[in-house]
Amino acid sequence: MRSRKVLILAVAFAFTLSTLTPANADNPPRRILSGWLPDYSLARNLPTVEGNLDLIRDISPFWYGLTGETSIKDKYALGKYTTPIEQVISRLKANNLILLPTITDDNPKLVLANLLANPSSRTNIVQTIKALVLKYNYDGIDLDFETFYTQDGRSSWATLKPNWIAFIKELSTALHDQGKLLSVTTP
């Protein structure tokens, strides 16, 4: 009986090894990178993105900042670019890039923490972000909310954590229901 179990295990192990694809230095796996597009010098940075399309799958331009429960600062407009944002969006999409603009937390200390603690305010933020994504038909959004960590202090995280998780769940559901993506950068 024992030799039978050993035989079965040996055959299973041999089968597993035979189905593995060996590494091949001549054909390394393709790297797929996500990149952020800084909100300065678009004229210089956009051609850099376009020159690396074989590497980049999705791009997150720093174009927005959450400034309140229902308000988002348009950093692209504030940058005084001469090219309308719609043309830049078309150019990025024409290159088959997944467009996930970055939205930062541009609120003063403890503002976001207080907003996320209120379910009604949290829902308003979700709806405001979703409306932005739908307005420009973005593929989704990239959250880069770090102010609560850097300005509010690490000790605030214990209180904020359950509200942050509820916010991420609510936003991801709202976006996924529209076929949109959510990328989250957190400290």
Regions found by a protein language model. Name each.
Residues 63, 126-159:
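Active-site groove signature of glycoside hydrolases
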Residues 19-27:
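Sec-dependent signal peptide cleavage junction
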